Regions:
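Beta1/beta-strand and adjacent pyrophosphate-binding region of the FAD-binding site
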Residues: 2-16, 32
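Glycine-rich, N-terminal phosphate-binding loop of Rossmann-like dinucleotide-binding domains
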Residues: 13, 57, 218-219
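FAD cofactor-binding and catalytic pocket of flavoenzymes
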Residues: 24, 275-293
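Glycine-rich FAD pyrophosphate-binding loop
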Residues: 26-46
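N-terminal glycine-rich dinucleotide-binding loop that anchors FAD/FMN and/or NAD(P) in oxidoreductases
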Residues: 47-85
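Conserved redox-cofactor binding core of oxidoreductases
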Residues: 102-205, 224-227, 275-277
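Glycine-rich loop(s) and the adjacent beta-strand/alpha-helix scaffold that form part
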Residues: 200-204, 209-281
Length: 293
């Protein structure tokens, strides 16, 4: 079996994975990213989103820091409002029925604006969501709900910008590369065994990637009918998947097999009304237009 090594191995190819790779690179680490999908289908569920990202902001200057292309005229005709830490906390509690992890929630809320500025520094551009999050009242756009900005180009644009940033920083992205198991012992996780697709088939060459640290960012199990039925209940095997067909729970299963502790809400999910005639999995050309709510 061929073997290569790196400082940090990131399993997954969506927003979280790319940001983890860029952060590790900032600290001087060599990084390899494993993306199970092909170049054309890369990006995980991030590529299927609208690219809208919620963040704390206290005034228009915070918005302009994220959207420096905003003109003075656009600012003058817009009431962005504010979205405070307290409001973000309240929304997280209300929408999760207070099941949200308090420590993770605090990190998300208090670091949200700094994180957005960091993502902006990596080349991701943001614009206000005038079309969906603002109403025009007496000649002035008024935003509601605390959600104000979206990545230019939506989810696909977000993935494209982060991929460009990785390429500029010599982060190696391996496409068609599926991690099959973690390499671990009593001292921790030291890499992964990886099957590399050949000629479009996942039955390919298996290689070993040794790493000083492994970041698991491989998404959930929504594209796995068996796991949906096991954790969500009867009938969920028939559900149509809004996003990528590659999120089959591999990362979760590998982590559990390596001794990780199961945590969180396994019997709940986010689901919406979806077109009866939609394909089994998401279609990047159609995006979220199969949605019926």
């Amino acid at each position: 079996m061929a073997e290569i090594s790196t400082d940090v191995l990131v399993i997954g190819g969506g927003n979280a994975a790319m940001c983890a790779a860029l952060s590790a690179c900032e600290q001087g680490a060599s990084v390899i990213v494993l993306e199970r999908a092909s170049v054309e289908e890369a990006g995980g569920n991030s590529a299927f989103t609208a690219g809208n990202i919620r963040t704390v902001f206290n005034d228009v200057d915070d918005i302009r820091a994220l959207c420096p292309d905003l003109s003075d005229d656009e600012v003058a005709m817009t009431d962005f409002g504010t979205y405070t830490e307290d409001e973000f906390y309240d929304d997280m509690g209300r929408l999760t029925e207070y099941k949200t992890d308090p420590d993770m929630c605090e990190l998300l809320v208090t670091k949200s604006l700094d994180t957005m500025k960091w993502v902006r520094s990596k080349g991701v551009r943001f614009l206000p969501i005038y079309g969906k999050q603002a109403f025009k009242i007496d000649g002035k756009f008024k935003f509601w709900g605390g959600l104000v900005v979206s990545a230019v180009g939506g989810g696909p644009g977000l993935v494209e910008s982060l991929t460009e940033a990785c390429n500029k920083n010599d982060i190696k992205i391996m496409y068609g590369a599926r991690a099959t198991s973690l390499i671990h012992d009593d001292d921790g996780v030291h890499g992964a065994n990886v099957r590399v697709r050949e000629d479009g088939e996942e039955r390919g060459t298996t290689i070993k990637i040794a790493a000083r640290a492994v970041v698991m960012a491989a998404g959930g199990f929504q594209a796995n009918p068996e796991m949906r039925t096991r954790y969500l209940g009867p009938g969920w095997d028939l559900a149509k998947v809004r996003g990528t067909r590659f999120n089959t729970g591999d990362g979760i299963n590998m982590a559990l097999e390596a001794g990780a502790r199961a945590y969180g809400n396994w019997s709940g999910c986010h689901a919406v009304g979806w077109d009866y005639n939609a394909p089994e999995f998401g279609d990047l050309d159609v995006g979220d237009n199969f949605q019926k709510h």
